[in-house]
Amino acid sequence: FPTRRSSDLEDYISDMTIVFDDMGYLTLKEGSKPLAFGTEIGAFVRLDDLDTGYAFKEIDRSIFMNPDKINARLVMPVASYKDIIKGYPIDLFLYANNYEEVKDDIGEIDFFKNAKDAIAVCKKGARMAKGTTTELGLVTSYFANPFGPVQKQELVNVLIDKYFDDLFKTGVKVGQIRTSLGVKGQEKDGPKKAAKKLFELIIK
């Protein structure tokens, strides 16, 4: 990041690497923060979720699926293999809360005081489904996973406790970010405001 301050966020960013779009995994490392790895070099995204014109700038590198229909998707490359397998220490771990409206007493970002509270929110998996899958409206599912039945929860619960305890013990900030993506009228401005708050937190 440059040393000078500016209202233009781009002045702070020289490069950005996407380690994983929506599928990755964590490993514990003794004596340090958990590490994050990616599992894929591309992203499978909704056309409507991208900035206007961005997808078409990448048209020669992307695969478009039904671009004329609702929930049109595209596959596009976002990272190299060497980037996703490197393993990056985690500094910040946030649950994406897209359904709560940001108000005077409810900010875009807040942090959990302990692992128990963080686990409760993640296990509940509340989110405002926008019809991108078979779900619609405010729904809940184990770790917000809308695909298929949850399996082997008893085995997974042991891992969840272990990993969240390690996040807190190693000083990782664990919380939630309210994107307002599922709040009517805030679909565009909400995520932008949340992103700015996140950026302000990062550069502190």
Name the predicted role of every residue range.
Residues 1-6:
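Short, small-residue-biased leader/transition segments that mark boundaries at the very start
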Residues 12-83:
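Conserved nucleotide-sensing/catalytic segment adjacent to the nucleotide-binding pocket
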Residues 65-204:
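Conserved NTP phosphate-binding and transfer environment spanning the P-loop NTPase/kinase superfamily
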